Amino acid sequence: MIERGKFRSLTLVNWNGFFARTFDLDELVTTLSGGNGAGKSTTMAAFVTALIPDLTLLHFRNTTEAGATSGSRDKGLHGKLRAGVCYSVLDVINSRHQRVVVGVRLQQVAGRDRKVDIKPFAIQGLPTSILPTQLLTETLNDRQARVVSLNELKDKLEAMEGVQFKQFNSITEYHSLMFDLGVVARRLRSASDRSKYYRLIEASLYGGISSTITRSLRDYLLPENSGVRKAFQDMEAALRENRMTLEAIRVTQSDRDLFKHLISEATNYVAADYMRHANERRIHLDKALEYRRDLFTSRSQLAAEQYKHVEMARELQEHNGAEGDLEADYQAASDHLNLVQTALRQQEKIERYEADLDELQIRLEEQNEVVAEAADQQEENEARAEAAELEVDELKNQLADYQQALDVQQTRAIQYNQALQALERAKTLCHLPDLTPESADEWLETFQAKEQEATEKMLSLEQKMSVAQTAHSQFEQAYQLVAAINGPLARNEAWDVARELLRDGVNQRHQAEQAQGLRSRLNELEQRLREQQDAERQLAEFCKRQGKRYDIDDLETLHQELEARIASLADSVSNAQEQRMTLRQELEQLQSRTQTLMRRAPIWLAAQNSLNQLCEQSGEQFESGQEVTEYLQQLLEREREAIVERDEVGARKRAIDEEIERLSQPGGSEDPRLNALAERFGGVLLSEIYDDVSLEDAPYFSALYGPSRHAIVVPDLSQVAEQLEGLEDCPEDLYLIEGDPQSFDDSVFSVDELEKAVVVKIADRQWRYSRFPTLPLFGRAARENRIETLHAERESLSERFATLSFDVQKTQRLHQAFSRFIGSHLAVAFEDDPEEEIRKLNSRRGELERALNAHESDNQQNRVQYEQAKEGVSALNRLLPRLNLLADDTLADRVDEIQERLDEAQEAVRFIQQHGNQLAKLEPIVSVLQSDPEQFEQLKEDYAYAQQTQRDARQQAFALAEVVQRRAHFSYSDSAEMLSGNSDLNEKLRQRLQQAESERSRAREAMRSHVAQLNQYNQVLASLKSSYDTKKELLNDLYKELQDIGVRADAGAEERARQRRDELHTQLSNNRSRRNQLEKALTFCEAEMDNLTRKLRKLERDYCEMREQVVSAKAGWCAVMRLVKDNGVERRLHRRELAYLSADELRSMSDKALGALRLAVADNEHLRDVLRISEDPKRPERKIQFFVAVYQHLRERIRQDIIRTDDPVEAIEQMEIELSRLTEELTNREQKLAISSRSVANIIRKTIQREQNRIRMLNQGLQSVSFGQVNSVRLNVNVRETHSTLLDVLSEQHEQHQDLFNSNRLTFSEALAKLYQRLNPQIDMGQRTPQTIGEELLDYRNYLEMEVEVNRGSDGWLRAESGALSTGEAIGTGMSILVMVVQSWEDESRRLRGKDISPCRLLFLDEAARLDARSIATLFELCERLEMQLIIAAPENISPEKGTTYKLVRKVFNNHEHVHVVGLRGFAAPVPEALPGTADAS
């Protein structure tokens, strides 16, 4: 067990009241007891000054200044010192039993600012026999001594053997030594660390719960995970550097692209212009020869055009004269056609209206019959309704009478009276004065027979009435038809006129039937007449063209002569055509072959250029495609070998990277699962415990632990046993060692050390022999040594890999070039030169063109004669079939005769069309016109009389029937019989009344419905009559209009008129077409003559100019060629494939390149000026100068340390290979450097879990601490909700926020800050940058919230605040917090210092009077359990039972102040024991 270091003593030299005083410090509690002003605070101030000699922090205020920051100008230190040199020295024995003396030299600085000068120093190796006061003072005599200066102290110590004296210029160095030697618990690297330490001491000194510490518990208790932050910062710095390098590579690539672009565009700019001038020079020579040839050809063409112009002018004049006559004839034919079409439309209307009239006539007759029947029915309905009405009235009267007489006494009298009334009414109606009730039956039968007879007579008359009405309507219909055909006439004349009309209709129909044949005959004759006239016109025109008058009989002879002439000319023309065709075919073949060669020439030239480049790149000469393919196979083999070697080097480099990454893991854990298991089991990796082992001891410890060097050290194996059940995610062999990770040693094994090996006795029957490894990896030093070796090997491999990658890429590019050549140019690269063959073909083409021109001039005359003869034969072929027509003189008379007969037939057709339907209707009913049915009115009167007779007979029979019915009323047998009879009669009367009323209702309804129907029939009849009259009037008007037109409208009239018009239109169109052709030809001929004239003048002028231009351009071209050859750029500029482009294409190519070059050289003043000068089109040699300047500029920019060539094109090629390799390597490096968000979350979460476990262990040490009502103290650590959400998102939902972490514009810290803002938009980030926020989020301490809680009395656990606790409880709670902080610092710093050092623990407590005895005893117990030293300042009445107590009394003797000190150890013993060395040195 390592002993904890202790403060042995505190020495004050030349302090106020203390000249040279040494306080021996107790191992636990040292109490300074004394009254006010005794020097207790001064003693503690000296101790604190020696611990933290930082004037920016020191501020010794009394307790009345609590919370003040500027109580006095000197902050309490200047007034505690005396003038001169002062010392405050601490004597320490550390865990290694080394004596260390550390302290400060203080001296007041003169001036009103009351400043103090402090110099820290340290002494090592001082013998224990020498006291600090002996070093710091010099005894002058028995009563006097003086304080030595710092230089004197240094000289005194240097004289001692083995003693080291160190004076420090900075507080950081002073504290670094104190940390290394175990004086302070924490390495105080910065002012912030010193401030935390001072605040801790200050809080301990003045007691209570320090708000400064409680607010910053995270900074005090939680260690800064600087390794993680530094790893992230290094990663981001490496990524940033990597991206900057990539950006620089991209800039270099853009520069490379610019150079490549500059070369390409400069070559296009100059080469296009160079080849354009070369082409133009050749073209100008060809044009000069062509102009001279065209000049002679144009002169001959002008003479031929002048002769042609005279002939066409004569023919045009003839056509202009004939056009007027044709236009007049065509207009007359068009007008006649319009009249015929109008007459036909009128005829169609007439036929349509006649059909409508016939239909209306039939409908009108039908409607008249319907109306008559409806009127008869209406009269019958009225009679029935009237009879029904009378019967109902009669029955109602009878029923009313019987109802009135229903009284038993009056009924009989009433009925008897009614019977008498009925008898009288029957006598009156029947004219029978002798009628009695007994004879009524006989008379009833008589009158019923009379009624039957009257009814039969009425029905007979009704039938006769119907027949007469039908005859009357037929007569009227026949009469109307006769009147419609003949016009108005008397009724008695209708029969005679109708017979005459029928006989005339038969004749007219016969003539109408002949009209169609006459019309066909007339059409045929008219067609022949037109053909005759057309043949006469053609004959006249033929004679005009031939210039001679021919008879009809001479035409056949002339036709034979012309055919013979055509045959002879056709043979000559045919032979000429064959000869010309042969020449043209040969010429076309030459041209086709030339075009094929010209299309192939650029391809062949490109193939040759590519082949030359391959030869230059490979250093080989190729004569055939087979040699190229064989060399490609060699390249493939070479590339395969280089790739294999490169991959082997890359695999070795990756293996080294993985090993470096594995060795760089914190704690030496090669398996990340071991870290998780160590946290799970609450243990520490064995490699982490031995992380600080030296390089010399690493082989020993590596062999000592053997396979268990990766074991986990746990406090208790029994607690881990339960967790091992079901454990799967772990290495195959997991070693667990029980022990205290804080004080672990190698005593767990029995070991015998041999030469470079060890024998480990694991058990009585099991030993393990392990040799020292040649490459030990146990401990940080061994791993770092191995990492340095691996880094060196990796650098050499990287250089070899880069060289091999360059060679591979160069071989691949050469392979790609060969592959492109084989795929694109191998088929044509080794063929014959097409340009040589083109020159030969051009020579032969010139010979053929001259032969064709000579042949064309000879063949032209034969062709003209052939065309004239052929035209004459064509005209005769049209005339010869019409010779018979030309000889027929009677054709016109026959046409006139047929025309007259057709007119008569047309009149008959019109009569039949107009009256045919009427005659057809009249013929079957003409017989009814023989007699006029005038007796129809008498028949109507007889029918009305019969109806009246029938009604009278019906009334008489009814009256007699009533008498018969009332016959019982004339004699009654008795009252009962009379009553019964009355009841029966009453019932019968009621039934008859109901029947009569029903009959009356039906009669009325039938009459009403029939009246409405009759009205509808009458309306329809009136509408039909109106329509008939209207259409009749329109038909008459149409007949009148047709007569006014005066044109015969038969079926073929329109066709004949249209045919005539079309023939004239055709003749007019042909004439106009020919005239237009002649005018156009004449205009074209005149224009051609003008063009030829202008062309002659232009050709003469152009020929002279071209000849002068050829001569003048020769001098400039010679200068260009001289400049090109002198600078050796002809190979770059004379691009033969450009010779096959047109001048416009070359000029466009040069202009595009010029525009690109203006942008490319905008930043280069020299090239910009040269380019501007080269734009002069009259000075082509300046473009060559620009090209030479560009190449010179690029040669100067080539880095000879990287690229080994002077050619800019080859330099660009090598730059592309090198940049491609660097880009790929840096991209892979960036992917390796990048860290995932899930890994960040896991690292932070594991760190939080580890620190929570550590705080939990610290809480266990404070569970038994109690002060007053405070039973226990604990520290709560919770993760903030916002930060917990951030960790969850980073680990589980990071895919949703890849836009932040995959962005090249954001570092990981900035992306983390952006994500935090996105998840917590409600939090105001202030003016902090995302980088600052991200760095804070990488610190796990910002994820935690910490607060102190106390278990006080009945309140339970509450937050530790001064207002809720008593003063003593607050002091005790604050002291507990400070103890926890100190212990946390020790745990944090254990890995930073040696394993054999346990630092000193010491705290202060001023004004301990505020604590009771139990609280002070608790402090003593806490100090004993934690091995902590405590210095207490207490008043005189406080005397602890344990520890060392110093009684301080300040005295004044001869105006000289000094403090008298008496030291006592405890008060439990009866006799106090005085400590040695308590006499006052004063």
From Swiss-Prot:
Region (Flexible hinge): 666-783
Highest taxon in the source lineage: Bacteria
Pfam families registered for this protein in UniProt: MukB, MukB_hinge, SbcC_Walker_B
Gene Ontology CC annotations of this record: cytoplasm; nucleoid
Region (Disordered): 1056-1075
Extent of Basic and acidic residues compositional bias: 1056-1065
GO-annotated biological processes: cell division; chromosome condensation; chromosome segregation; DNA replication
Alphabetical list of InterPro entries matching this protein: MukB (IPR012090), MukB/SMC (IPR050308), MukB_hinge (IPR032520), MukB_hinge_sf (IPR042501), MukB_N_dom (IPR007406), P-loop_NTPase (IPR027417)
Gene3D superfamilies according to UniProt: 1.20.58.850, 3.40.1140.10, Immunoglobulin FC, subunit C, MukB, hinge domain
Gene Ontology molecular function, alphabetical: ATP binding; DNA binding
Localization of this protein: Cytoplasm, Nucleoid
Residues where ATP binds: G34, G35, N36, G37, A38, G39, K40, S41
Disulphide-bonded residues: none
Keywords: ATP-binding, Cell cycle, Cell division, Chromosome partition, Coiled coil, Cytoplasm, DNA condensation, DNA-binding, Nucleotide-binding
Coiled coil residues, start to end: 326-472, 507-602, 832-1110, 1209-1265
Reported function: Plays a central role in chromosome condensation, segregation and cell cycle progression. Functions as a homodimer, which is essential for chromosome partition. Involved in negative DNA supercoiling in vivo, and by this means organize and compact chromosomes. May achieve or facilitate chromosome segregation by condensation DNA from both sides of a centrally located replisome during cell division.
UniProt record similarity statement: Belongs to the SMC family. MukB subfamily.
Note on domains (UniProt): The hinge domain, which separates the large intramolecular coiled coil regions, allows the homodimerization, forming a V-shaped homodimer.
PANTHER family the UniProt entry points to: CHROMOSOME PARTITION PROTEIN MUKB, DUF4476 DOMAIN-CONTAINING PROTEIN
Subunit architecture: Homodimerization via its hinge domain. Binds to DNA via its C-terminal region. Interacts, and probably forms a ternary complex, with MukE and MukF via its C-terminal region. The complex formation is stimulated by calcium or magnesium. Interacts with tubulin-related protein FtsZ.
HAMAP family assigned: MukB (MF_01800)
Stated name of the protein: Chromosome partition protein MukB
Organism, scientific name: Klebsiella pneumoniae (strain 342)
